[in-house]
């Protein structure tokens, strides 16, 4: 029974997954497609956590000489006997994953690179004594293993030439050209960009790829994966037989991520069919080529949690697996037009953008449109259509936030940004606090409207009215807590005959403040909403808790909101 199989949470080693009997969503058609759409160098660009590393590990297991062919028993590729006979286990493979090449300095990142290369060199230790190699070639291999103080000795030139040298030695040993697999090729560039050594890392990667992929006569073919397609002029200079399979390409569009039918089968296998709608709402929505796919990391993690707790709620697994600095970068640079576009996305609408798929990292901040492009290629936005630009042969993409989880990324980043904005605006906060204490409804409304005019709304326009009211309640609560740290503020606590939205206990022991929040669908309804709030305070006797504590001077406010405007009514009871 499939539901007795372990779920591969965090397992990206194909051999381990198959030998240890983990559940596997069959992606071996990738092998067939790769060979039928052959290119000397193929780059797959996909967002984080979409199965890139597992697929690369699967390719290694298929092509590598001496592989255990039983790993593929019962999988799609085993049905193509002719292809398996010709290619399975027939090539030496070099496999590097660059996902851990990082450091605060270039030297730290270089050492991390050397450790990864050294691990692969050590795996090929049989070359040191190969009788197919000349003594000079054996010494060349041993030159890659020289240690000093427990660390491999590599300089830049040695690292750059290492892949090409290993290819040559493996070809000499086996009499077969080499398959090179490089996973997460752009992580070192991303980290270098973030930490200020981008040019040095570009030089290193360009040199390594130039020798390994361009002038390597011992190369059968190479496959690379990453999140971004770095422009050919930056990294892949001179590569002629080079294909890029991005998220817009229909080829291979179902081989990274789970399709709807695969998710339905997974849920059925574990007896969780009833959770289909929530899984789709939270983790589906990505459009690669002509395929609609789910994030596999999310689906596997959620099903695993459901096995332990049938009442488990969807979580933001993808968000928590790494940083979300791109969204924050967009928000920090947003002008009024960009803020409006973000609000439309949050509300579930589409925006239209011309997308560049071949940026370099050092171009990301050149224009705000470049940030939109990177948000698209890294999975924060997805395409639902195209629009032809006027007087042009070019097209703009219609972009949306793919699902609830990614919407949560935007919401959380906007909230953090807004907290920082509020914390740094002492003048507005002081005026807000003073207006409340002085019962100055005009100044209070003006300051609230100023603040809301600067914010990015995270209001879901499709949400029911009570949820919209909750949004404004949370917004006001955050502002009040930032306006006067000496106030004791209680939210939605029981008082009198019901629950008051907000109770404030200032330093003055005689003074108490009650605030009721209302949502109005239209601006013309703000007056009536304020009146309803004031009537509710009196009818429900929300002031009783404060009076029971000896606070005899009570100020009450009804505050009504509509979009980015509010109206305030106040009274002393």
Predicted feature descriptions by range:
Residues 1-64, 68-80:
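Walker A/P-loop-proximal flanking segment of P-loop NTPase domains
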Residues 9-18, 101, 108, 112-160, ...:
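Conserved P-loop NTPase mechanochemical-coupling segment
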Residues 10, 26, 61-126:
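P-loop NTPase motor core
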Residues 121, 162-173, 200-220, 542-545:
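Substrate-engagement module of ASCE P-loop NTPases
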Residues 214-219, 230-248:
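Short regulatory helix/loop adjacent to the ATP-binding pocket of P-loop NTPases
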Residues 234-237, 245-304, 341:
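Amphipathic alpha-helical segments of the small helical/lid subdomains adjacent to P-loop NTPase cores
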Residues 242, 294-541, 566-573:
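Extended alpha-helical interface modules used as scaffolds for assembling large macromolecular complexes
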Residues 545, 549-573:
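Domain-level recognition of nuclease-like catalytic cores that cleave nucleotide substrates
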């Amino acid at each position: 029974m499939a539901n007795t199989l372990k779920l591969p949470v965090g397992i990206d080693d194909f051999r381990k997954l198959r030998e240890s009997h983990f559940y596997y969503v069959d992606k071996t058609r990738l092998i067939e497609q790769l060979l039928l759409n052959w290119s000397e160098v193929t780059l797959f660009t996909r967002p984080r956590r979409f199965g890139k590393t597992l697929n690369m590990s699967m390719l290694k297991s298929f092509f590598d000489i001496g592989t255990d062919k039983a790993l593929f028993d019962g999988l799609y590729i085993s049905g193509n006997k002719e292809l398996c006979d010709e290619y399975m286990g027939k090539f030496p493979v070099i496999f590097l994953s660059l996902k851990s090449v990082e450091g605060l300095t270039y030297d730290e990142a270089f050492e991390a690179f050397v450790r990864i290369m050294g691990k692969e060199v050590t795996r090929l230790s049989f070359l040191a004594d190969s009788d197919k190699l000349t003594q000079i070639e054996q010494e060349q291999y041993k030159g890659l293993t020289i240690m000093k103080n427990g660390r491999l000795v590599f300089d830049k030139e040695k690292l750059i030439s290492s892949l090409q040298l290993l290819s040559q030695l493996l070809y000499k040993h086996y009499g077969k050209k080499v398959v090179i697999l490089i996973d997460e090729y752009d992580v070192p560039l991303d980290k270098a960009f973030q930490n200020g050594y981008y040019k040095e890392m570009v030089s290193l990667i360009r040199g390594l790829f130039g020798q390994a992929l361009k002038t390597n006569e011992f190369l059968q073919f190479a496959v690379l994966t990453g999140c971004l397609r770095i422009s050919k002029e930056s990294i892949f200079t001179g590569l002629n037989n080079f294909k890029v399979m991005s998220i817009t390409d229909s080829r291979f569009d179902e081989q990274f991520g789970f399709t709807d039918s695969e998710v339905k089968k997974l849920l059925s296998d574990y007896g969780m069919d009833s959770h289909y709608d929530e899984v789709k709402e939270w983790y589906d929505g990505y459009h690669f080529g002509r395929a609609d796919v789910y994030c596999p990391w999310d689906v596997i993690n959620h099903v695993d949690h459901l096995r332990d707790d049938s009442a488990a709620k969807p979580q933001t697994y993808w968000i928590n697996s790494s940083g979300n600095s791109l969204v924050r970068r967009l928000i920090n640079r947003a002008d009024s037009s960009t803020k409006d576009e973000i609000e439309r996305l949050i509300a579930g609408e589409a925006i239209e953008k011309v997308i560049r798929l071949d940026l370099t990292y050092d171009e990301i901040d050149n224009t705000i449109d470049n940030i939109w492009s990177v948000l698209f290629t890294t999975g924060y936005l997805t395409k639902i259509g195209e629009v032809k630009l006027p007087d042009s042969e070019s097209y703009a993409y219609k972009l949306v936030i793919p699902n609830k989880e990614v919407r949560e990324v935007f919401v959380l980043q906007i909230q953090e940004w807004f907290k920082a904005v509020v914390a740094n605006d002492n003048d507005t906060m002081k005026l807000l606090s003073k207006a409340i204490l002085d019962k100055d409804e005009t100044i209070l409304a003006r300051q609230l409207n100023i603040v809301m005019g600067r914010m990015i709304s995270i209001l879901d326009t499709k949400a029911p009215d009570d949820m919209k009211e909750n949004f404004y309640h949370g917004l006001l609560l955050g502002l009040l807590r930032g306006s006067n740290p000496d106030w004791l503020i209680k939210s939605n606590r029981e008082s009198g005959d019901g629950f008051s939205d907000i109770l404030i206990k200032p330093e003055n022991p005689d003074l108490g403040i009650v605030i009721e929040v209302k949502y109005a669908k239209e601006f013309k309804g703000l007056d009536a909403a304020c009146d309803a709030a004031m009537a509710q305070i009196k009818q429900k006797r929300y002031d009783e808790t404060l009076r029971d504590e000896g606070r005899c001077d009570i100020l009450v406010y009804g505050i009504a909101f509509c979009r980015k405007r509010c109206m305030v009514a106040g009274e002393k009871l």
